[in-house]
Amino acid sequence: MLDRRSFLRYGRPPVATSEASLAPYAPSDAAPWDAARARHLLRRTGIGARRDDVDALLAMTPEDAVDRIVRTARNRPPLPEPLWIGERKPRARAPQEERQAWIDKNDGWLAEMYQGTYDRLLGDDVHGRFRRLGEAFRARMTAFWANHFVADLRTHKIAVWLFEYRQTLRAHALGNVRDAVHDIGLTASMLDYLDGNTNRAGAPNENYARELLELFTMGQVGPDGTDNYTQADIAELARALTGWTTSKHGEAAVEFNADRFDSGPKTVLGQTGDYGYDDVVPLLFQERAWEIAHFVGRKLCREFVRDEPDPAFVDVVARRLLDEDFELLPVVLAVLKSAHFFDAAHVGALIRSPVELMLGTHFGFGRDVYDGDLQTLRNKTRRMGQDVFDPPDVRGWELGRAWINTGTIEDRVRYGRELVHHAPPSFIPDTLARPVAADPRALTAALCEEHLAWTLTDDEVDDLANDHLRNGVSDYYWDPASDDAAVRLHSLLIALLSLPAYQLR
């Protein structure tokens, strides 16, 4: 049985052999450009690593592979506007039937948004390998920023607002951090979630100002251990953010009301002026550039490298972010091309989120996510601690080891096993038809490499082959064409998905 304590012991030594720098990865005998590293790149930029994608990457240099995925992601188009984007929410005094009809339609629109989010992470409905891989990475980066600029399902209950919020995150997924901070604060979801609607001259609401400093830009404490701001800064910043409200009819548009704006002088981070919304975001990046770069840089390192990144590497990434004037594209390219990223100590060093685990299993077994799967998928990821549009609070999900506890670990294993039972009908026969299937150990090793982010020892592979394919006897008695071969292979796949290593990426 998989328990939390054994799971948390199951990991690589935390010490990398590469230096904490952005020096590019150069394949060598000690660190070859092989299937394990190609899968590592695919799992960190997408939701999984299929054999044909691995082969395609290995036909390229690692530098070219990163370029194709990341630059394609950057060039992916905006989300197409749904047909319902202009529909207005009925007024509160509208007949009950009209209001209920809108609620029913809105629920359907929200379901469309869930389906679209899963499809994009899987790269579905995108033709061409690198367009598909690029779309999956764009979706991953959108999800990354959704866990940074957090708004919850209470505000997303209006589908138009959710679409605008996700479209804004997607637009800035690999863009400029400063621009992202500016634009996300003027979405209806964020104004509603952090009480911008009630922030007005003479009666400021400090919620958004506080989270803008603490969670969206610099954090409470800088890398040198000193406070980044004071309560007075929060109060003055809140005054500068007054005047903006959401539409009262469920539209995505936000409005500036000069009568609600505090036009007096404010002092923020030691600077004084008649600041408004458009003034204070550049001011924060001017006065706390290093602190913001470090705060965001550490999050990028946690996303791509490991949950507790090397502080020296965080400093290097933060410095590069500063040098690039907070443009993400060159920074992400540098991180993913670095020897530090490809260091063996970082392969399989991150724990999959519930959404990554469930969608990754669908992806690994070639199973699409259909409309009928949506509620089941959402219910299961919620039980494991993640509802894709509904983070627990404004801090978002904690990630890493926080995903694993006594209440979630059995669900994570059980749901993975269930997906094996519902793999496409062709998966088992196609696997048994592969040339490698003639050798039970070789087949076991191949499946371990394909489905696990962490390479097992030779003894572990032997044990799996012996327990499930050989059935405790010699290779002579293994025949992939036999009547019981499918049953044995199914048993092996269940065993693989029950391993702690399957929870990693």
Regions inferred by a protein language model and the residue ranges of each:
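Short, charged early-sequence alpha-helical segments and their helix-coil boundaries
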Residues: 64-93, 184, 335, 416-417, ...
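Solvent-exposed, amphipathic alpha-helical "stalk/arm" or coiled-coil-like segments used as scaffolds
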Residues: 111-115, 119, 138, 142, ...
